[in-house]
Amino acid sequence: MEVLMAERADLVFHNKVIDATAMKRLISRLIDHFGMAYTSHILDQVKTLGFQQATATSISLGIDDLLTIPSKGWLVQDAEQQSLILEKHHHYGNVHAVEKLRQSIEIWYATSEYLRQEMHPNFRMTDPSNPVHIMSFSGARGNASQVHQLVGMRGLMSDPQGQMIDLPIQSNLREGLSLTEYIISCYGARKGVVDTAVRTSDAGYLTRRLVEVVQHIVVRRTDCGTIRGISVSPRNGMTEKILIQTLIGRVLADDIYMGLRCIATRNQDIGIGLVNRFITFRAQSIYIRTPFICRSTSWICRLCYGRSPTHGDLVELGEAVGIIAGQSIGEPGTQLTLRTFHTGGVFTGGTAEHVRAPSNGKIKFNECLVHPTRTRHGHPAFLCYIDLYVTIESQDIIHNVNIPPKSFLLVQNDQYVESEQVIAEIRAGTSTFNFKERVRKHIYSDSEGEMHWSTDVYHAPEYRYGNVHLLPKTSHLWILSGGPCRSSIVPFSLHKDQDQMNVHSLSVERRYISDLSVTNDRVRHKLFSSDPSGKKKERILDYSGPDRIVSNGHWNFLYPAILHENSDLLAKRRRNRFIIPFQYDQEREKELMPRSGISIEIPINGILRRDTILAYFDDPRYRRSSSGITKYGTIEVDSIVKKEDLIEYRGAKEFRPKYQMKVDRFFFIPEEVHILPGSSPIMVRNNSIIGVDTRIALNTRSRVGGLVRVERKKKKIELKIFSGDIHFPGETDKISRHSGILIPPGTGKKNSKESKKWKNWIYVQRITPTKKKYFVSVRPVVTYEIADGINLGTLFPQDLLQERDNVQLRVVNYILYGNGKPIRGIYHTSIQLVRTCLVLNWDQDRNGSIEEVHASFVEVGTNDLIRDFIRIDLVKSPISYIGKRDDTTGSGLIPDNESDRTNINTFYSKTRIQSLTQHQGTIRTFLNRNKECQSFLILSSSDCSRIGPFNGSKSHKVTKESIKEDPMIPIRNSLGPLGTVPKIANFYSSYYLITHNQILLNKYLLLDNLKQTFQVLKYYLMDENGRIYNPNLHSNIIFNPFDLNWCFLRHDYCEETSTIISLGQFICENVCISKYGPHIKSGQVLIVHVDSLVIRSAKPHLATPGATVHGHYGEILSEGDTLVTFIYEKSRSGDITQGLPKVEQVLEVRSIDSISMNLEKRIEGWNEHITRILGIPWGFLIGAELTIAQSRISLVNKIQKVYRSQGVQIHNRHIEIIVRQITSKVLVSEDGMSNVFSPGELIGLLRAERTGRALEEGICYRAILLGITRASLNTQSFISEASFQETARVLAKAALRGRIDWLKGLKENVVLGGMIPVGTGFKGLVHRSRQHNNIPLEIKKKNLFEGEMRDILFHHRELLSSCIPKNFHDTSEQSFTGFNDS
């Protein structure tokens, strides 16, 4: 007090404008200087003055006082312009939906924020005495956000879930809202208005529960004698402000020395002077007392509580600090909930900071330290991992700019930047406390069409048969327009008169694979190719001018390589690999190969794992042409999908089982199915019976007779016709109500009048047209027996299969459809019921370490005869040949930009490559960006023979000779269209387009002699990596004429454009392909004429890494199917509507987020470790102590974090008192139990300690976290519990147990009408506390114990460091730092 008296002379003199916060500071300083009474007198005068002035000024608020900010018009216009550009990019396929949403939110958020910052200076300049300005900025009424909505713009709103609506409200409330804007703003504000009532009641209930937990805590003693403390240290990154907040008003638990000099003693309370001294002396760690370490659970002592926040002195005896604490935490809740109401659901988000260039100049940085990436808006950028120094050289000075780690660099090296240009973007710090959540966003296709993607897409290996694909890097998905050929009559046709059209398709789960050969029948040569159906098939080549030929390879193999005839590949036996020959021509008849061709499945990366299906073929015996249902009858089926194959990919389980057969019989029940559009009229009724060739719909007739079932689904009608007989059963017949039963041949109907035996299997199904009547349809069944599989010897040479150390094959039969699955046949196609698969296997013992084998596809040409081989290597390293730059092999044509890289090729050995050097050939290198290896596509002079055996064709030989004469022509000729990846300079970066290749073979090989161009369109697809692969068969797709765009080019097209356009290439919108300017629609080049192109329109969708692609390559998607699922993190709006439930979750100890582990789990782990190390009595005690300390600190941090993020300051000690009550119980466990407590009983920790010491026998217990509700129901007083919840239950239990209520708390006394033991009523306890003076001895004993305890905790670090992540001491320090990271 002497100090205060001395300072009374120095009166505080203020001469400045005071707002609300300054007023608070002033009042607290006044209290410090003059005490309570004097201050209240001063404040009274201020109040009177204020009212006088307000009356004199008489501020009124009219609508004219709301002045809109002048710069608003062009700011909004600018933002709209940016949104428009963004929309365009999304349309072109440069950014995807999530990036677009994210960027548009940030554009509008930034605009809105900018307007908000303009508001204050604008008012200050134009109209400083504006009532809105005065009220808002003095803190009297209305905050910046509300005024901003009145005079700025409302901006982005959030919907009731706290998600963003990406349509901003551009007008403010002064200008008035349009109808749309009004609806959007009401949509989000409902949360604010309606929920306010609910939320207020929530906050009230929270307060009630909090007070319930701590109402009995009263200051009852000056010092409890504890010698523990929690250390706070200024070292670890605490700001001074936070340190001061933490320390002021606490009491020291230990003396503090500076060297040998003691600067503060134990039990001294910390004032601002002392804190400053600590900061100047840089005291290492300061032990303070907190409610956590007070010795009793039912009261608290003055020193552990510290100063009372009201009058800056140690708290008085008899103060009800518990209730104060409950109210301090609950009350801001009510304020905070109201806050949503004030801003009406306006969204707040975070924007990133920018680094701008200090002056004009050239920018330079070290490119090794950065890594190219996409920003979250889809712009290309560099990511720097460590601090990056960027130099900007202008004419005379060099500026250095430091860019912090994890930032995005938005410029390229050596680029010229202008002053104030944004060169880097710093990630928005995590200091903004926004709750992140992971969101799935599905992108749906907006048109019908065929899906195409780059080879980048890979399966998760577990999903060989599923449709979950992951994208490892950014690429496009294209939806090529055109619908599948359905069973309706095609109203238009693309084919010219007399074209030959050959459509054959087979259906494998909605993939309509078919082949389309379209030509004019003038000049024809036949080509043979193996087809899935195994029929020899004509491919027709056309010499007669620029007409369209679509001819396809069939396999998805890597890099078909053409080797010269000297190569030694034909040897069939090699160790560790085997080679399967395919016959292209008549030789097939000589070998006993079954009619149905073998289809080989090799993944695109060429790597096969054990038990992968290598090849399959479809036995024609198990092919049906009509729809129907498969049933297994008595078969045991072993579904191949085992438990471990099913991996949950981000929550979605998807796989497609194939069923492996154990027994050799299954049944097929045919039915006819028609799928009609929803609008079409149907000529027959449901459950009616029709004959063959009845007219069902306008142009559809039934092929079989029978019972009709009509089912209406979304947008279409499914009409089924069941063939077979119909029986009306008598009353005695019991027919199962199930979907249907199979009856074996030879069984008749018992007890019925007509006894009829069936010769074959039948399927009986009960049909109920009305409730009472029903009849039975008996349908014929086709029975299939399954053979034991084909003899492998007929497929492959015998010696191949007998090798021991080789790759082996097993034959497995799969049924393709599940039991009872309906099978739909598409128009005129056949359905394969059983597929025979060859499964790879190899010897585990010998090659135990080998997980995967590499397959390659090799094509060998010998004198017009072409053989294809698959080679499967068990060899570990795929790299078998390295060619250096000066090597003779490399002296072919390697493009300049890639010539200095080492060419590593995966499929050739050295000897084999050498044979190529005798003939001059072109080597075209494709850089494979994923792996650091390159692959060759070699066009040697034997290239032309690849076209196939042209029987006696002259032009063929001419071509070969002319190539030999002038080796440069084929190079020039084929390098143009073959494998060029045009870089399209797009709006702000270059995207690689997906290209297809054509090989142009000119008859006389002269460019200007265009009339006689001989075109073979070999249909390749090239992906964004420059890898080439064959697509699968061309689908049976009918184009709509409107989907094709004709694009006319100049006649000089061949010289200029042939490098840009190749057949099958995908062209994004807005790309220049001719002199006339950009192309209008995006699409795929379908037909190339000399002077024009036909482009099939396609829609690109961009997808980034980590996205999931649904569906299969080449699958036909209908409108509205899901294409891609993006998973992205977004911050929920930082509304306290999310904040209050968070506080409540922490206090009720529910698990909050999946990321931070639930504290309870952590607690259990700790308990086990420590008990194991220290043995029983100490182990339980210390285990419980440490766990409790840990969880207490982290709970306090979590609660503070939520409140701080809302700008609400609550003193830590209030939260501590409450947390102490939640964590002060332990749960008695069973083992080693003495008879004192029953297992599962909750007792206080201190009580457990004392009982354990008294009994000198360990009680086993573990720490437990109670929520506030449970804590309220587990107090010492049953009257208080009964008045809280579940009155009857609590009272009945108390009566049964014979509980005694000592009436220590406030509530019990209030209920019974006694005097409450706080404040003046506290005197009743004074004589008790006097008795404590004569117990120094007991305290000393306790101190002995406490000393040992403290030793164990703080000094024996070696002992604990093995089981405690950080020792106790540090954890508390660090977590106190954590308290204050708001």
Curated annotation (Swiss-Prot):
CDD domains, sorted: RNAP_beta'_C
EC numbers: 2.7.7.6
Listed GO MF terms: DNA binding; DNA-directed RNA polymerase activity; zinc ion binding
InterPro entries referenced in this protein's UniProt entry, alphabetically: DNA-dir_RpoC2_beta_pp, RNA_pol_beta''_euk, RNA_pol_Rpb1_3_sf, RNA_pol_Rpb1_4, RNA_pol_Rpb1_5, Rpb1_funnel_sf
Gene3D superfamilies associated with the record: 1.10.132.30, 1.10.150.390, 1.10.1790.20, RNA polymerase Rpb1, domain 3
Function: DNA-dependent RNA polymerase catalyzes the transcription of DNA into RNA using the four ribonucleoside triphosphates as substrates.
Family: Belongs to the RNA polymerase beta' chain family. RpoC2 subfamily.
Assembly and interaction partners: In plastids the minimal PEP RNA polymerase catalytic core is composed of four subunits: alpha, beta, beta', and beta''. When a (nuclear-encoded) sigma factor is associated with the core the holoenzyme is formed, which can initiate transcription.
Identification of the protein by name: DNA-directed RNA polymerase subunit beta''
